[in-house]
Amino acid sequence: MTANVSGIGSVLQQMQAMAAQASGGVASPAAALAGSGAATAGTFASAMKASLDKISGDQQRALGEAQAFEVGAANVSLNDVMVDMQKANIGFQFGLQVRNKLVSAYNDIMQMSV
């Protein structure tokens, strides 16, 4: 249960960093991600890869926990499974929206005349 609370705290910290960046409080996205521990290098590619790896890891962990619950493991409770599944879903939806924004920005740039 303590891991879930610290996980929620981590997600909250990332959301606050993104909100600060959106309002102009943080100079760059790399600085916002570095504060949350998501990216160690300052490049966009490394930040994107770290985010995708985290999303994939969350999904794999949630799936493993769900399978453990299904076979009746004593140390896995239903509420932990549900919370981890929702965290994985939210992470995936966030990644999907980031991808959509990147594609939209790319299309806008491609339509600009030089």
UniProtKB/Swiss-Prot annotation:
Keyword flag NAD: no
GO process terms (BP): bacterial-type flagellum-dependent cell motility
Localization per record: Bacterial flagellum basal body
Matches recorded under InterPro entries: FliE (IPR001624)
Claim: Cytoplasm is one of the keywords in the record: no
Gene Ontology cellular component annotations, sorted alphabetically: bacterial-type flagellum basal body
Protein name: Flagellar hook-basal body complex protein FliE
Species of the source: Burkholderia multivorans (strain ATCC 17616 / 249)
